[in-house]
Amino acid sequence: MKRSVIFWLTIMLTFDIFAQPGFLTVAEKSDFKSTSNYKDINDYIDKLLKSSPYIRRETMATSIEGREVPLLIIGNPLPKSPADLINDKRIVVYIQADIHAGEVEGKEATQMYLRDLLKEKNPEILKNVVLLVCPLFNPDGNEKISPLNRTYQNGPENGVGVRFNGQFLDLNRDAMKAESPEVRGVLTNVFNKWDPAIFMDCHTTDGSYHVEPTTFCWMVNPDGDNSLIAYMREKMMPEMSKTLSDKYNILNCFYGEFFDMLNPGKGWVLDASEPRYITNYYGIRNRLGILNENYVYADFKSRVMGCYYLIHSLLDYASGHKSEIRNILSETDKKTIAKGDNPSVTDSFAIDYNVRPLPDKVTIRTYEAELVNETNGWKNYHRTDRQQDVTVPYYIDYYATKNVRFPFAYLITIKDPAITDLLKIHGVKFEKLSADARIEVQRFDINELKGSTKLNQGHYTNTIDGKYVNGPVDFPAGTIIVRTAQPLGNLAAYLLEPQPNDGILFWNFLDRYLVPQWGLGYNQYPVYKVLDRTDIKSKPEI
């Protein structure tokens, strides 16, 4: 009885606190002239924690400069850990903001959404959803707020942070190589630990002129399960768009940019398909990834409110379709495991791909543009005041142009903790060969290895050419075995295949092993493929 009285007293006090005018975000208090810094965010989180029994905080990561990356868990009942959700019918949704700290709408919108959600006595959404929120994924970049950053952006006038983290890394290019504490934190403490069904990452556009303040799209990499891409493209995203427009009165369109601003009829394209982009990465994991891009030239308040109502639209959909989504994801995992357990000759993995338009065109509200000679000698597009609506092809359907066989397993012959640690961070399961064995495999013989001429995120990234050769190879006990009969089998393939544009070879994890000391010829690529189902004696990795 005493505990019940305390609980309801807490609820009553909650609504007194939420009713106070002081429970506003920095953006709201400043009439959308400013955005929150690190202290502002943490003070606001403290208010939320004191005001509601439905929220708690964890630390997802600690940045290179020593700042905590917050993870907020919201639920009714509030789970203490993922173990509480084993027999729970609710769906887990994760929303992340400020991965680029100059793109701050999501940071403000998530704070506002949580306040408004938690002031309800018994939030309807929380009957069906466990919500995870990180309002500040890049705290080091956020602390560099200045009006000199992103000066072309339409507010907030008192400035925003910078794109990169404390290591000068773009966190939205780090999903595969996982070099930053922030990305390692989200992989370990959110994706692996909580396994959200849906993930949305909030950004601001840098591209074409249009009217809609809010844009979004879905994961697109063709090495993810195509049935999930089709579900988002054909059902989930159109329904969210309609809700955002009809229920919340927010103009919106699917994200992209024009091939040619002077001739927008050529098409609207999403040109970021690799899994280094974290929403595409999430699709490779057999889950639903959403990219939110708020229109850079809309005023700051419109961008924040558009993002705020997009969050509403997402959670409306997730709450109303929780069973459907859970079933789709469960079936996709089973399908991936079955493919890896006994792959056929037709099971393939794309190592190169291209984009084509969807069958249906999209309408974008845009402006005529002019190409202007700047005083510095550059030529830039300038928007005119002449608005036009264009119905154009939407290039977002990525498809394979070159495939290799999807294997039963990969065998890794080098014992490098950087590689095994990377597999663990991603949640990819692996074992070790329990005894010496001769195994029929496919090896990759290198003909040419090239590093890029320019640095990319601190790397001279690799491209490789060679040929596949089948035959028996003797492997010693302790050889690492990565079986593809696991939910993350597609991710394992992307990391370990020699030729993808985002694997361990591309990001230089194998450089020291590929070229002999004196630089003559090439060593054997140290990852072998077991193409067909094979009895491999193994022991678990401890």
Positions of the model-derived regions?
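Positively charged n-region of N-terminal signal peptides that target proteins for export
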Residues: 1-4
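Cleavable N-terminal signal peptides
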Residues: 6-7, 17, 173
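Boundary at the C-terminal end of the N-terminal hydrophobic targeting segment
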Residues: 17-24
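Soluble metallo-hydrolase cores and metallopeptidase-like ectodomains found primarily
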Residues: 39-93
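Active-site/substrate-binding loop(s) of hydrolase catalytic cores
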Residues: 86-96, 104-237, 241-265, 270-273
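Hard-cation-handling environments
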Residues: 258-441
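Catalytic centers of hydrolytic enzymes
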Residues: 409, 421-425, 431-432, 448-542
